[in-house]
Amino acid sequence: MASPMEAYAFVVSAGVFGLLFASFLFWEVSKIKVTRRGDGYSLLAADVRHHTADRLFEIYSAIQEGARAFLLAEYTLCFAFIIVFGAIITVLTSYVNKPDQTFDWTAGALTATAFAVGGLTSMVAGYLGMMVAVYSNARTTVSAMKEGARGWIESFNTAFRAGGVMGFGLTSLALLVLFILIKAFETQYPLATHSKQLFEAIAGYGLGGSSIALFGRVGGGIYTKAADVGADLAGKVVENIPEDDPRNPATIADNVGDNVGDVAGMGSDLFGSLAEATCATLVISTQSTEIIAAGWPAVLFPLVITATGIFVSAACTFLATHVWVVKAEKDVETVLKVQIFSSTALMTALVVPVAYWLLPAEFVIAGVYHCTPIRAFYCVAVGLWGGCVVGFVTEYFTSHSYHPVREVAQACETGAATNIIYGLALGYKSAIVPITVISIAVYVGFSTAGMYGVALAALGFLGTLATSLAIDVYGPICDNAGGIAEMAELPAEGFAIGSAALVSLALFGGFVTRIEETTINILSPITFAGLFMGAMLPYWFTAMTMKSVGVAAMEMVKEVKRQFATIPGLLEGLPGHGPPDHAKCIKISTDASLREMIPPGLLVILSPIITGTFFGVHAVSGLLVGALTSGVQLAISQSNTGGAWDNAKKYVEKGCVSIEDKEGKLIVQGKGSAIHKAAVIGDTVGDPLKDTSGPALNILMKLMAIISLVFGDFFKSINGGRGLLNIPLDTVAAAAPVVPTH
């Protein structure tokens, strides 16, 4: 078994290595220069005119400025939130209501400190990731200008390396900061005697990360879709001009939104997932006297899983950039699949020796589940491969390389209504396999090691986070690069939801561990009522976010139409026409997102606090289970429906859909056709589903659970967990079925 120093060295070395590797990838991207008048090596392509180089630089600068301005405004509000909510955490988590002590200010202060550190770390990771993405967008465009296979190789490598900067930087930063926080808190709460208090305080770190992710996902999602939907409606549908046309005043805001929502928001989301899964595992591990007795090597097992994933992801990165290279469009999906499969396989092989290296030969969780290192490996492995399967299934239902999306595209032949009907059906159907996979992971983890096994399965889902995040960020960078190319007149989300579901369940395990409940009676009236209320919350949340996008999009359409009407020659594209006012559109998106993200945020944050305060811990248990079971289904169906509509539109734009004319000849239906307009309507409806409401439901599931975990002792201290209304914890016959939590 490893010594404490060996475990420390492995975690720290992985974190430092990950940051250095992220720096190396950024250095590779920075070799491509984007300058005016083609001064840089990047603009030496023979067909690039000087005015095009200038235009490229201007667009890149405008996107960079807009992204920085939005994030500054959003993070100013987030910083104020950290201060205010941190004070609330300090007071409420200090309240213990014991005969000999009313407040434990040490516990409250440490929890609030962990919360602030988690929030600030998430903000730093999101900001750096977004700025790297903005930095890389134009460079990806430039790389794609090269002819033939060279253009594909260099553009793919540029975007993939930029995604890697985000993936390795975020994962390593989360790991290092959490480890430093644990060792700092140990001075107040020694592991051997105060392990429970130590990791309950550390749980604030996950709460901080997830709180910022809420504002990043909701605010960023509203920003990007207000601009995107507004640009599409005013441009392609109303005025019949192409997507990302430089005449459209909303295009810069649209491209800023790709970075704000799809990069910064997603990065904060997955940062929160990693922090929460790790914190939940640490809290639940205190139920095993053998793990605590074995010391830091066994306790740090969840951190070492993440550390191992950093090394594995780094090794597999070179497969995509140097071994299976992208030489044509058809190679992209294959290379990304190889990347996912190879990293998952290598990670699976390495978890076995890691488990035997760190964990005791036998240990018991909650006095019930007898575990061994190989059983712990099974839990991690089912999460690893579950994430892989969910990713592939999501691709099947959202890529136009496969039948489901092509079927949706063909449905556009009879109009937008059938397109929407087919898309909704696809989204609902796409939830079947992911939910089955998640259920299997939960069953294997729970039956093997109780809630500790479920938490390990969640960590398995996130085991190769650096690789998964690199691939996720690759998409928005390429999307943005394509938008820049079209504006410069050059030639023309499943994993996160699956991990969020398992993380939420792991946090639920941490919550019931903290409130020291051995069973939750699902037929207890208060628990059953809480379950129904929890199942309703994702729908309420979706209604809020969808309407917010609609309100902001209407403002954007009116502004774009005003500019087309008042700026001479803009719509017609006449020589010497006045420039569109991009700043006005950026301001509309910024103001709308900051204004509209507050009500959904309050709904998520206050729901468990109010429920626990007034109705007690069993009502909270029902609330969390209800929100999880309905939220994960809704998130998958919304995200995949929107993704299918998006790719059905792209399939039509590629000229892959044809209809017969009166003479029986096939006529290609590309851009500008009636079929294309129907596809655009579906894509526009799906935009807020796949980029705002669907992804933000991840945060709803996780944030409600981590809030309940952090405030668990406070809820328990109010009338013994019965709440201010003093509701009995169990008022049903003894024969009623119960859900074991240990």
Model-derived features: where do they sit?
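Hydrophobic packing and interface segments
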Residues: 1-742
